[in-house]
Amino acid sequence: MDPASIIGIVLAFAAIFGANIMEGGNPMSIMLVPPLNLVIGGTVGAAMAGGIMRDTTGIIGQLKRAMTMKKMPADQLISTVVSLAERARREGLLALEEAAKDVEQPFLRRGLQMAIDGTDPDELSEILYSEVDAKRKADKSGAKVFSDMGAYAPTIGIIGTVMGLVHVLENLSNPDELGHLIAGAFVATLWGVMTANCLWLPIGARLKRVSEIECDQMELAVEGILAIQAGANPRVVGQKLRSLLPPDEVKPEKKAA
């Protein structure tokens, strides 16, 4: 699991509340239920209105995916593909039928099975890349929900502040309460801006990044599957797949003992 999002969100909120304390403020003065209820509920409701029910019901799953991203290291994926290529070159493609069942990555496993079943290379490439494109579109929709929430939240907060100021004007006859009421009115704007920039927008950006990583790995797997099907030299397969990685992810090949 990559903890960057959890650490970043905690750090952002800690910095804000820490600054409030250092300035002599009371953290509980901004932990007001009505503004929180308005901002969170209004933001989620606005996002629901702008999409379809499937997008909204997937929020929890997308949130979990953003926070607990799991991926096979690229060098491990390449090692798996090279190992399969060596066996296929030595024993034939059909010999991979049992080995394919032990492959950890579902996409790679399905692609290998299709290759073993004799699917035409061009058709196999089209099917696998179509699956990558479909995943990319689905991930884009999931990230958009959080990006939209980040756009709505500040405006919802302003609505809360206006409502609070209306309440202030209703109590002008009680000057002793005005300071408290005005401060409370602006808490909604604070939570709107804070949740947008410290929660919703970062999660949306995280989902986009996770999608990029996962789709890149799927494309890497496609190239490996097609190379195995073509009977390519395992060393060439490894070199080709490593050439598709960013320089900082490339690890030197292990030399034979």
What is each stretch, according to the model?
Residues 3-7, 15-142, 214-257:
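Large intracellular
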Residues 7-27, 131-210:
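Helix-termination/interfacial motifs at the ends of transmembrane alpha-helices
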